[in-house]
């Protein structure tokens, strides 16, 4: 067995995604994805999803991530990590599934032929638009590792061209609806991800503190493969920073004392949703074609129902 990769604090330009996701820092480290788990769930959930803390951890293989990963790789320089599985329209047949499993076992991204063609189309539009908008992609798929008061942090940047961090997002949502896009970004934890990446970059490059900028490059998954350049407003930046700090503080505490608490073992009284209360109260008093309870019971007693 080969020794797992272990890297010191700093910038590392050529780290395989498998090594990064296995946690290549000197000590068990926190990523933005795991920080999201700490904020949205509990420390125990984060422990279960950490490759170096949970001895039974198994990486997740999911076709929904394949297209995005392949586009990232293609934008970063080619198709060396992409395995094209030919002769199939989907993954339903056993032979296709066997080739997919073999590709994953070899550290490759399995794609059907039409999926690879889609990757090429998306990447072509992305590169063309980036050039037209004057966006420098700089170093792509590079890893930054930093220590924050005893807490080790790691981040894999899609594109790092100081002072800019560019984050590619391949999306099926409607990119034309700003309100829906903002909700999606917060629900997915993109606000905290941006704050986390900026924080790690500033720890590695302290001379850039206060000058690191972050933008999302949203790409449509389907034609016409449009690209939207999104930056966070002041509120999104501040809320992301608060969530990030909360996650780092919990990580540091749990790693230090070796305790990863789950849910509280105390009853918690949940508040009834305001909007559901209003909905029912309005129904009680509003004119309606539906019989009320008194009228309905009266008709039942009279044999009319």
Model-identified regions with their sequence ranges:
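Metal-dependent nuclease catalytic cores that hydrolyze phosphodiester bonds in DNA/RNA
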Residues: 1-155
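Metal-dependent nuclease catalytic regions and adjoining charged, substrate-binding loops involved
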Residues: 4-10, 110, 186-188, 196-305
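Short acidic (Asp/Glu) and glycine-rich catalytic loops that position anionic groups and cofactors
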Residues: 48-52, 174-175, 221-227
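Short histidine-centered catalytic/ligand-binding loop motif
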Residues: 57-60, 104-111, 177-189, 233-235
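Short, well-structured alpha-helical interface segments that form or flank functional binding sites
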Residues: 66, 152-154, 189-192, 196, ...
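Hydrophobic/aromatic-lined pockets within catalytic cores
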Residues: 75-79, 170-173, 202-206, 252
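Secondary-structure boundary elements
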Residues: 129-136, 161-167, 202-212
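Non-catalytic protein-protein interaction segments used by genome-maintenance enzymes to assemble
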Residues: 144-191
